[in-house]
Every structure is written in structure tokens, then in C-alpha cells.
């Protein structure tokens, strides 16, 4: 009799625990944690709540800007981001830009791997990536980045340190691009914060920086994930500040023309989890 009582209590406790776990997992799956990329410039591998495949449509408008901060004119991009297993994530993008009387295209493929964390929907994770880009200027660029993120139901933090090697004349031997983003829950599934990107920051101490000098983009960000929806929305806008100007003329290079004036860019992303 006592054995049956203990067995019954054990079964009831087990069922209660499983139901509670399912409720928590379902809540996280349908939360802001399930989106593929809350930020516009700062990318990371997928957390367990977002380990699916998503289609991302992004676009923007910019003036006096360069890749990867934006595009001079109007650009539109279609991307796919998906989970490959064992904490590997793949990101692909194709884009088209209209500006300066020309039509230009852009392609990207990148694979991410989380080495620390990445086993729980919330908390800290850290990893790296390797990829290749064909820029709007037709330059071929190989990139690798260290990426870190921290997420919970109220906060989102992300940071990238991205190293690029462009195979084109008139470009730096290597470029370092740093970015970070912070989002705080405002109400429900609506988040607000800021995202910043620094490019060619070696121009702060090198007067002969090959690509015109240091550039910084910083601006407010919004992110929204409707409850029990496969959609997510992100928006960022801000000025592009040319903090320093190199003694090398930007127009010495026939490959691409670099702006001399401060600029601005507006960028959005609409994500859809299709698998």
C-alpha cells in the first residue's frame, strides 16, 4: 500500500514537472527570444528558442554612406537564417541597391558557431563566424567575427568584433568593424534601445588610413515580436559620422568613392519563421 502511494505521488510530481517545463518552453518559444535577429547590424548565432529557419526581408535608405553601414540610395535584401545543429547557424543574404543612377547587387554567406553558452534560450553565449561577401562595389570580402549576446525576456545585449579582408586595390589590408546593440522591453513584446557601429577605427590613430578615416553610426532601435506570431520587426536610424579624414584622398581609389560629408541611414527588417 505504501509502495503504491509513493509511486502515485512520484507519477503526479513527474507529470506536474513536465507540464510546467512545457509551459515554460512554449512561453519562451512564442516570446521575443524566438526571433532570428533582433538587431540590424550586430549578428549572432541562434539561441535554442529560435532554432528554426527564417526568411528576412530588409531594406533601407542612406546618404553619404558605405558598406556595411548602409547604401547610398535605396536597397532591398532577402536573407535566410537557419539552425544547422550542434550550435551552428547559417546566414545568407542577397541584395539590390538603386542609387547614383546605377543598380548594384550584394551577396553574403556566413556560418556561426557558439562555443560558450547557446544551450539555453536565455543567458550569455559567445562564438565566432566565417563568411564571404560580394559588396555593392563588386569587391570580394572574406570576414570573420567574434560575437557575444545576452538575452532574457526583458533585455537584449549583443556585440560583434568583425575582421574583414577585401580583395581589391585601394582597400585596407584588413578592416576591423565593431558593433553593439542594447534593447530593453518597453511594453509587452515591444523593445527599444540603441545600436552603434564603428568602421575603420584605426583611422583614429593612422593619418594615412586607406579608406578615408574612421566612421561611426549610432542611432535608436525598435524591435517588436507579436505574441504567438511568426513575424518580427526591427528598425534603426541614425547619423553616420566621419570622425576623422585620412590624408589619402578617398578618390585615389578607382574601386569605390567614399563620402567626404557626414551622412545618415534608415534600415528595417521583417523576419518570418517558416520552418
Give the ranges of each region predicted by the language model.
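Bacterial N-terminal signal peptides that target proteins for export
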Residues: 1-7
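Sec/Tat signal peptide C-region and signal peptidase I cleavage site
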Residues: 17-21
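Transmembrane beta-barrel domains of Gram-negative outer membranes and organellar outer membranes
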Residues: 22-144, 149-168, 175, 183, ...
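Bacterial N-terminal signal peptides
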Residues: 8-16
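General helical structural elements
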Residues: 7-8, 117
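Anionic-ligand binding region
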Residues: 178
Amino acid at each position: 500500500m505504501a509502495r503504491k502511494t509513493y509511486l502515485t505521488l512520484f507519477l503526479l510530481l513527474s507529470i506536474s514537472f513536465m507540464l510546467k517545463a512545457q509551459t515554460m518552453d512554449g512561453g519562451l518559444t512564442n516570446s521575443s527570444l524566438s526571433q532570428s535577429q533582433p538587431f540590424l547590424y550586430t549578428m549572432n548565432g541562434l539561441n535554442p528558442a529560435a532554432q528554426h529557419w527564417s526568411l528576412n526581408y530588409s531594406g533601407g535608405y542612406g546618404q553619404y554612406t558605405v558598406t556595411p553601414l548602409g547604401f547610398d540610395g535605396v536597397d532591398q535584401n532577402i536573407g535566410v537564417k537557419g539552425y544547422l545543429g550542434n550550435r551552428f547557424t547559417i546566414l545568407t543574404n542577397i541584395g539590390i541597391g538603386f542609387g547614383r543612377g546605377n543598380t548594384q547587387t550584394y551577396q553574403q554567406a556566413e556560418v556561426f558557431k557558439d562555443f560558450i553558452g547557446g544551450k539555453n534560450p536565455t543567458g550569455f553565449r559567445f562564438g565566432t563566424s566565417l563568411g564571404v561577401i560580394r559588396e555593392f562595389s563588386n569587391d570580394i570580402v572574406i570576414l570573420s567575427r567574434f560575437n557575444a549576446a545576452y538575452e532574457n525576456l526583458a533585455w537584449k545585449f549583443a556585440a560583434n568584433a568583425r575582421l574583414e579582408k577585401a580583395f581589391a586595390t585601394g582597400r585596407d589590408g584588413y578592416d576591423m568593424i565593431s558593433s553593439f546593440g542594447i534593447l530593453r522591453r518597453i511594453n509587452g513584446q515591444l523593445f527599444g534601445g540603441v545600436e552603434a557601429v564603428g568602421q575603420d577605427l584605426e583611422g583614429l590613430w593612422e593619418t594615412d588610413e586607406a579608406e578615408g578615416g574612421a566612421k561611426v553610426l549610432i542611432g535608436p532601435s525598435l524591435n517588436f515580436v507579436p505574441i504567438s506570431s511568426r513575424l518580427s520587426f526591427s528598425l534603426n536610424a541614425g547619423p553616420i559620422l566621419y570622425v576623422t579624414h585620412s590624408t589619402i584622398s578617398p578618390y585615389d581609389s578607382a574601386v569605390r568613392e567614399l563620402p567626404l560629408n557626414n551622412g545618415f541611414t534608415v534600415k528595417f527588417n521583417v523576419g518570418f519563421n517558416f520552418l
